[in-house]
Amino acid sequence: DIESCDRVGLIQAMPAGDAEKDVFDRRWEQRLELMKEAIIYNRNNPSIIFYESGNRGVSREHMLQMKAIRDEFDPHGGRASGSREMLNINEAEYGGEMLYINKSKKHPMWSMEYHRDEGLRKYWDEQSYPYHKEGDGPLYRGKPAFEYNHNMDTFAASMVERWFEYWQERPGTGKRVSDGGTKIIFSDTNTHHRGEANYRSSGVTDAMRIPKDAFFAHQVMWNGWVSPEKDATYIVGHWNYKPGTIKQTEYVVSTGDEVELFINGKSLGMGERSNQWLFTWKNVPFEAGKIEAVAYTYDKSDKKSKDAKTKKETSRYAIETAGEPHHIKLTSIQNPEGFKADGADMALIQVEVVDKQGRRCPLDNRTIHFNYQGEMEWIGGLATPNEETQKALAAKNQSLVVDKNETAEQKAARKAAD
């Protein structure tokens, strides 16, 4: 993981064990020993910026001990030594709560687990099969868990809302600022969960790395350094509803100052803007064809009047209604260096149901049966309670399965049929 972050330029906080609290006696001694060994092993990895003393605050005395280890074994690395919380301990070189907006004029303050909401990729919205009601799911600690059972439209919108809270307190906006936060999960994974599935679904991709709408929403917001540097627009969801459907809410994420929505060339007007990048339309009538969002940005450089502004189109995005399912498309996602028949390499097989023009059919949920030939092992796909390993539900009409090859002597072939 550390080398992967080095390669793509993701900054990291390196922990030294954790008990969700400050500890004492031999347990604290073990944490000090682990921090020493971790620093020695990882101090030449450039993606590590922070040395984390604990996932909860530690005492001033313990903070000084951790800093002493850093000073001895990595005196010139430029890393900050701190911990979660630590708002009241001046010796900590960084801090921040788990979820909230903390600001400081001295130390970096960032949230350690921002946006813990969950949502399964198979749930588009309330008006699409399988018609999952927003927030519907099992109780968590005896209470409704709405925020852990999102549909993908509201999940993407909540991502925009949450990131805006950090962005508006970003560096450069005053003397006391927030330095942002770390997304708790990038891809759905087998960690502590609160939603209906047996794994955490807070990711912007599912566990097989298929993007959710929230992934593309982040591409719009994170298209640059602190603020987007390139204009972009994205329509959340699909455009395949039953005739006569009135879509309750249409979301668009855009860097524009205004966004105009068109259905088959007819304007539905400008969307209501919120949270900097989110634009919303209510009660949108479905009409098969093309839905398109056009973003405009104001030019305030007109020197004739302080209030003068002209708008120009800066980006657009469109979705077409997919036709009837026509065929299944398989795409192998392999090692960038090529598939190695060494008995250990794996291939992700992306499975899509598409129409005659190759457009993905978003609502076809028939079962797909898989067969394979050759020396390979079926590892499976997304974790579900169903233990049948030869079938996969075409959730939102796009799935991934994993194959592991057995020997270097035989080629393997896979076939899928509905």
Regions found by a protein language model. Name each.
Residues N240-T245, E337-A347:
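Short, solvent-exposed loop/linker segments at the N-terminal edge
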Residues F286-K290, A344-M346:
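Extracellular Ig-like/FN3 beta-sandwich strand-entry sites
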Residues G269-N275:
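Short beta-strand segments within Ig-like beta-sandwich modules, predominantly Fibronectin type-III
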Residues D1-A214, H218, S227-N240, G244, ...:
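Substrate-binding/catalytic cleft of secreted carbohydrate-active enzymes
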